[in-house]
Amino acid sequence: MQVNLEDVKIEPSWKEALKGEFLSLYFGDIKEKLICAKRAGIVYPPSNLIFNAFNLTPFDTVKVVILGQDPYHGPNQAMGLSFSVPNGVRIPPSLVNIYKEIYDDLGIREPNSGDLTYWAKQGVLLLNASLTVGANMANSHSGFGWQIFTDAVIKILSRERENIVFLLWGNPAKAKIPLIDTNKHLVLTAAHPSPLARGAFFGCRHFSKTNFYLTQHAKTPIDWDLNNFQI
């Protein structure tokens, strides 16, 4: 099965950059598996939010990539942005720890919302390795082929762009390092921010390090303070 490019609802610069992926047979297989999954049960996020990260952060605006694993699998959580939940939804433990690190790193007080749209609009691509998941079943769509697609996203960004900061937290994210040209981009690694993860996330200072790198390469730093974002 081949996907009709006109049916792919994604921001135009990404549609052009990823055209070869959308027209490939594996992407058609992803679509078929999604159709079957939706017939069998609930899929997160809603269809209109699957490409939310791309729609909020056009290809040429990407400054930072924060790689997650797969969407949250509880009701009303997933919004197509890694680690992010809609305003009003309880902030997940991993994001609580991210906020704690930002406070320790930059002195920014922890916000009341888990919505990371403000970061996305500044050029932070909040990318999950898998873009969909079945309700209450973590990693249930990991065999759909999404990682072929998101690996291609990373490779294309690495090849076509310069001076992007890749924040890779946890071993699955660190496994993506070979996809990135480290001569022209900055890769920062740490343990996953989940309370269940082993290793050090706290003290990584990735947020100040990111901004230092961006500033050194004549790019506007990220305002990590979500308290400045009006929902």
Swiss-Prot record:
Top-tier EC class: hydrolase
A GO term for molecular function: uracil DNA N-glycosylase activity
Biological-process GO terms, alphabetical: base-excision repair, AP site formation via deaminated base removal
Active-site annotation: 70
InterPro entries: UDG_fam1, Ura-DNA_Glyclase_AS, Uracil-DNA_glycosylase-like, Uracil-DNA_glycosylase-like_sf
Main location: cytoplasm
UniProt key word Hydrolase: yes
UniProt-annotated location(s): Cytoplasm
EC number annotated for this UniProt entry: 3.2.2.27
Family matches, as SMART domains: UDG, UreE_C
A Pfam family of this chain: UDG
Intrachain disulfide bonds: none
Keywords: Cytoplasm, DNA damage, DNA repair, Hydrolase
GO cellular component terms, semicolon-separated: cytoplasm
HAMAP family: UDG
Function, in words: Excises uracil residues from the DNA which can arise as a result of misincorporation of dUMP residues by DNA polymerase or due to deamination of cytosine.
Similarity remark: Belongs to the uracil-DNA glycosylase (UDG) superfamily. UNG family.
Protein name (database record): Uracil-DNA glycosylase
Source species taxonomy: Bacteria, Pseudomonadati, Campylobacterota, Epsilonproteobacteria, Campylobacterales
Designated gene of the protein: ung
